[in-house]
Amino acid sequence: MDFKIEKLPKVELHVHLDCCLSYEALIKIDPDVSLSTFKEKFIGTTCSCLKDYIKCADNALEYMQSKEQLEIVVEDLFNQFKEDNIVYAEVRFAPLLHINNGLSSREVVEIISNKTKLECLKSEIDVGLILCTLRHFTEEQSLETVNLVHQFSNENIVGFDIAADEAGFPLDNHIKAFEFAHKNNIYCTAHAGEALGAESVKSTLKNLKPHRIGHGVRCIDCLLYTSPSPRDS
């Protein structure tokens, strides 16, 4: 039997838009970036911790600040999906990270949402979008993000997430945003158990009550926190 994993249809539930910048997309935005620079600054061959890896995403974000740039990146991501035979994906991004060149957070969501819908029609790949707040965001920024999820609930925005450096920032600023999400029937996920241990997963489940945990690999540190139902933990 000629078995090739590349040909299998796949579901990808954890994609960060700012971590998917390919060299092909980058040189459409800035033709002067060399392949060696791309490998050094955007891939990171020596990332020893989450903070090091996030620096690569920060470099990519510099090229995701205009309508044209965002549309290039989204179209390129769909090309990557087609190469991997992805049939359904959930792509997350933080709108407030794309407003450095004059776009509003709402405009960012509109641009990415509209381009995603167009690419879905062209590719017949089904993609939902998840809006992220970040651990280092203020309470106001977190509430702004979840309100965008609510405002676009009739579009292709399917959920709310919290990402970034869990080791450096507590959950306090984000509790109200997740309470708002639950009151408005917004599906929630939360990154935890990646840079910290199982105790971080327990704290996240208790304080944010997400429907899913993103990563959660450190749950293995304590099997007590690997219940199939987060709401029962």
Model regions and ranges:
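Conserved small/polar residues in nucleotide/adenosyl-binding loops
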Residues: 225-232
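Divalent metal-dependent hydrolysis catalytic cores, especially in the metallo-beta-lactamase
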Residues: 10, 53-62, 81-101, 126-132, ...
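Divalent metal-binding pocket/active-site signature
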Residues: 93-221
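Short amphipathic alpha-helices and their capping/turn segments at secondary-structure boundaries
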Residues: 71-82, 223-224
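Divalent metal-binding segments
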Residues: 16, 55-75, 100-103
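Active-site gating loops and adjacent loop-to-helix segments of metal-dependent hydrolytic enzymes
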Residues: 26-68
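Aromatic/hydrophobic pocket-lining residues that form π-stacking "cages" and hydrophobic walls in ligand
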Residues: 26, 77, 112, 116, ...
